[in-house]
């Protein structure tokens, strides 16, 4: 993912700039001395020629390095690609042909081929690849524990561990969730979500609660956990702050964690509008009617914030009772196009005949037009 040699290139650029500064300094001294008759013309000419020679040498070295670097990396990438394809073929034949793979240690392209197979395959074949990765004793956990490893090298190691999905490597990942570098923290969170299983989910949840990641990153981690997300979501709901609570509520709806639907209901009375909206979205995605919370839904339907009214109108339709029908009828008079749309779709879901009445007799012309439009689309 990252080209190697950037440190040598940075050092070479620094040397070029340093030599140019020396050359310019020598020119300033020589010509200033000549200006005040302190030096003769030969000294000034010698300084000028030395500066020109030094500049030419520095630029030649820099240009040669850039050309050689690109030529070398292009040929190396081609060799690595061929080696990767060769190892991929050998491992595939061993996997489906029932033969043992070549004995380790394996080079870097071989490990990359194993990671690709681990990502593509499921079930028994994937577990066999995991065993081969364990036999290879890959360097990625050791890289993470090395104090002087570069940032790109650590990111590569975290990405490789995420692809390998070996539960025993979680302990090497968790310390990076408290790393001062936010990029490494995010990479560690993604890797931990791919790796954690069983008791490791509890340790991952505790580390995430202390990681200080933004809500979008936390939600991404929960979605990566997929069917393993419930313990982490429960930890967020119990001990999380605003960011963790929002991510947990979003994940409950997107992952269809129906057993946690009861935990969402109290957030309908949340003062924070973002958390309340997340709770409304979660219940709607779960198709979980909030029985006993009708008053809070009606209050949200009258809120000054449009996004809350939209979510409340959608969720009211799940109640399927007369109270919800009357509330959605009134919502057809809302000044917001999106609220009227949500109300009309909710009435269509509950009682198409009632929506047909709204299309004919609703007092608000915009409400009638919306009801007619939704009926035409449903026809």
Spans of model-derived segments:
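N-terminal alpha-helical membrane-insertion module
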Residues: 1-84
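N-terminal topogenic membrane-targeting module
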Residues: 48-56, 61-148
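Amphipathic alpha-helical scaffolding segments comprising HEAT/armadillo-like alpha-solenoid repeats
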Residues: 111-113, 130-147, 166-177, 197-208, ...
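Conserved hydrophobic register position within alpha-solenoid helical repeats
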Residues: 129, 157, 188, 217-218, ...
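Core register positions within helices of long alpha-helical scaffolds
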Residues: 132, 160, 191-194, 220-224, ...
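Short inter-helical turns and helix N-cap capping residues of alpha-solenoid HEAT/ARM repeat scaffolds
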Residues: 149-150, 180-182, 211-214, 240-242, ...
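Extracytoplasmic/periplasmic C-terminal soluble domains
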Residues: 182-288
């Amino acid at each position: 993912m990252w080209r190697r040699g950037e440190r040598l290139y940075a050092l070479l650029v620094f040397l070029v700039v340093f030599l140019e500064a020396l050359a310019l300094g020598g020119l300033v001294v020589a010509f200033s001395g000549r200006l005040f008759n302190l030096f003769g013309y030969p000294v000034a000419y010698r300084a000028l020629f030395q500066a020109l020679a030094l500049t030419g040498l520095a630029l030649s070295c820099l240009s040669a390095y850039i050309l050689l670097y690109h030529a070398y990396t292009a040929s190396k990438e081609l060799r690595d690609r061929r080696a990767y394809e060769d190892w991929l073929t050998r491992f595939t034949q061993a996997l489906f042909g029932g033969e043992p793979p070549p004995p380790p240690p394996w080079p870097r392209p071989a490990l990359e081929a194993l990671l690709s197979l681990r990502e593509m395959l499921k079930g028994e074949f994937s577990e066999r690849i995991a065993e081969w990765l364990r036999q290879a004793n890959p360097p990625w956990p050791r890289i993470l524990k090395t104090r002087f490893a570069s940032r790109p090298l650590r990111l590569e190691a975290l990405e490789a561990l995420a692809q390998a999905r070996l539960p025993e490597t979680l302990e090497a990942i968790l310390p990076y969730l408290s790393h001062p570098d936010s990029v490494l923290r995010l990479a560690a969170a993604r890797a931990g979500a791919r790796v954690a299983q069983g008791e490791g989910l509890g340790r991952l949840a505790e580390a995430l609660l202390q990681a200080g990641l933004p809500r979008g990153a936390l939600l991404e981690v929960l979605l990566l956990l997929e069917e393993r997300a419930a313990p982490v979501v429960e930890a967020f709901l119990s001990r999380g702050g605003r960011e963790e609570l929002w991510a947990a509520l979003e994940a409950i709806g997107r992952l269809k964690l129906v057993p946690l639907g009861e935990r969402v209901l109290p957030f309908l009375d949340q003062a924070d509008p973002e958390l309340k909206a997340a709770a409304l979205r979660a219940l709607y995605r779960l198709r979980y009617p909030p029985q006993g919370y009708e008053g809070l839904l009606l209050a949200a339907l009258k809120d000054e914030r449009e996004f809350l009214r939209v979510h409340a109108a959608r969720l009211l339709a799940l109640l399927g009772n007369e109270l919800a029908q009357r509330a959605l009828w009134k919502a057809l008079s809302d000044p917001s196009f999106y609220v009227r749309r949500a109300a009309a779709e909710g009435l269509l879901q509950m009682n198409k005949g009632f929506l047909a009445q709204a299309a004919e007799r609703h007092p608000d012309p915009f409400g009638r037009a919306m009801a007619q439009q939704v009926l035409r689309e449903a026809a």
